[in-house]
């Protein structure tokens, strides 16, 4: 089976993005927002990567299911993703949990999130449904995955990547035959099975699925009638198809969007504070694995109108400077030193402050003489003058949230408690 005429398969698809999760391992970073709404990379939110992949792949019909503390996410989507044109058969639907099936039921699983909106999805008359997780960082051409789905004749195509076994227990793990057909699918096993010939590696699901639309709707209706089901793709839908139908694996390495000749396939979960900090700080490398400067595959997002970043004062002990750092618009580095750090919009770092290995979210104000190292600072925090973080691990652990790798997470309530 081939595409209709020369029309890309992506133009016949609808992307359904699951964006309702909290991401509790991010601790206080998700106290006020869902994980897909967490800031990333200086200008974006995490969800922008899945959405940008869809748009860059040619998909022009998108639906986003939201649930946990969705206001920040919905506002971002309304401001940054409002460029779709219905007259061109484009659409962008935001679908908050709204008890559409029962007045006592919110979304109870990933599959249920689509089932509860099945009438809306069916109305778009898409040939394919591409199910996406809205909380991962990667660049991928979904057209390649759609092509494999059609050429193979599979009931479902599951995106997958090789992952160290030690890090795989939080993902669906699959075993495939020599042709890529999935023989077994285990959702989040405590002891992930290894790949044949690779004892330290498991084949993990990316939470990306391609279905023929009618087949998916039939599966969702069947699953909804099963009282023993969790109504979840990883726990129920995919294992059922593996057992009773045809499920094929799509290797991320074949559709990953790389920069130049870089052989690495970049994908990050950023599900913990340590992983989140590391993925952001990695962007300050001379040649980072994730290329945000790639004009051929841009990461679309809402961008505030701000003046350029400003660096002021040029005295020996009071010089506004930044080395190996990303500094967003509206920031002012006023006689302060910044090294290997990433600043989001509107951050101000005042005179004599020293900041190193820091991820600082929008509109943070760092007081004079502060010394900050190995930190993640939440939006809008006021850092007092002279505050020192990152030099005394025991003291940091008493005052802030510190991780196994020594990263301190700073929020305004933590700062407020310093004076009590």
From Swiss-Prot:
InterPro entries cross-referenced by the UniProt entry: ADP-Glc_PPase, ADP_Glu_pyroP_CS, GlgC_bac, GlmU/GlgC-like_hexapep, NTP_transferase_dom, Nucleotide-diphossugar_trans, Trimer_LpxA-like_sf
Q: Which reaction does it catalyse?
A: alpha-D-glucose 1-phosphate + ATP + H(+) = ADP-alpha-D-glucose + diphosphate
Q: One Pfam family from the UniProt entry?
A: NTP_transferase
Q: In which pathway does it act?
A: Glycan biosynthesis; glycogen biosynthesis
**Which Gene Ontology BP terms does the record give?**
glycogen biosynthetic process
Give the record's subunit note: Homotetramer.
PANTHER family the UniProt entry points to: GLUCOSE-1-PHOSPHATE ADENYLYLTRANSFERASE, GLUCOSE-1-PHOSPHATE ADENYLYLTRANSFERASE-RELATED
Q: What NCBIfam families does the annotation carry?
A: glgC (TIGR02091), PRK00725.1 (NF001947), PRK00844.1 (NF002023)
The family line of this record is: Belongs to the bacterial/plant glucose-1-phosphate adenylyltransferase family.
Quote the protein name from its UniProt record: Glucose-1-phosphate adenylyltransferase
- Give me the gene this protein comes from: glgC
């Amino acid at each position: 089976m081939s595409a209709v005429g020369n029309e890309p398969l992506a133009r016949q698809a609808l992307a359904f993005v699951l964006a309702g999760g909290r991401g509790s391992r991010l601790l206080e970073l998700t106290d006020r927002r869902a994980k897909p709404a967490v800031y990333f990379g200086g200008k974006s939110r995490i969800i922008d990567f899945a959405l940008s992949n869809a748009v860059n792949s040619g998909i022009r019909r998108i639906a986003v299911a939201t649930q946990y503390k969705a206001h920040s996410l919905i506002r971002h989507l309304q401001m940054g993703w409002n460029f779709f044109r219905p007259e061109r058969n484009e659409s962008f639907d935001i679908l908050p949990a709204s008890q559409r099936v029962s007045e006592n039921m919110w979304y109870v699983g990933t599959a249920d999130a689509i089932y509860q909106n099945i009438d809306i999805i069916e109305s778009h008359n898409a040939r394919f449904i591409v199910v996406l997780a809205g909380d991962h960082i990667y660049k991928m051409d979904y057209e390649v995955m759609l092509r494999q789905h059609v050429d193979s004749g599979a009931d479902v195509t599951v995106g997958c990547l090789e992952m160290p076994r030690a890090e795989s227990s939080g993902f669906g793990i699959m075993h495939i035959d020599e042709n890529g057909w999935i023989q077994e699918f285990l959702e989040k096993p405590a002891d992930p099975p290894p790949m044949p010939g690779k004892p330290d590696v498991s084949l993990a699901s990316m939470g990306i699925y391609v279905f023929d639309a009618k087949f998916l709707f039939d599966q969702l209706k069947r699953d909804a009638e099963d009282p023993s089901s969790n109504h979840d793709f990883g726990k129920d839908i995919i294992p059922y198809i593996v057992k009773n139908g045809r499920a094929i694996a799509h290797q991320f390495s074949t559709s990953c969007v790389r920069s130049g000749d870089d052989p690495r396939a970049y994908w990050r979960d950023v599900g913990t504070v340590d992983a989140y900090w590391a993925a952001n700080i990695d962007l300050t490398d001379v040649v980072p694995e994730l290329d945000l400067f790639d004009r051929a595959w841009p990461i679309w997002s809402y961008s505030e109108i701000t003046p350029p970043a400003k660096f002021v004062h040029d005295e020996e002990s009071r010089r506004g400077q930044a080395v190996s750092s990303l500094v967003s618009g509206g920031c002012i580095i006023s006689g302060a030193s910044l090294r290997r750090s990433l600043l989001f919009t509107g951050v101000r770092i005042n005179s004599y402050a020293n900041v190193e290995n820091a991820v600082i979210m929008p509109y943070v104000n760092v007081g004079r003489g502060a010394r900050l190292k190995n930190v993640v600072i939440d939006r809008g925090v006021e850092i007092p003058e002279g505050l020192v973080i990152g030099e005394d691990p025991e003291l940091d652990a008493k005052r802030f949230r510190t991780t196994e790798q020594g990263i301190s997470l700073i929020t305004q309530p933590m700062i407020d408690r310093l004076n009590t």
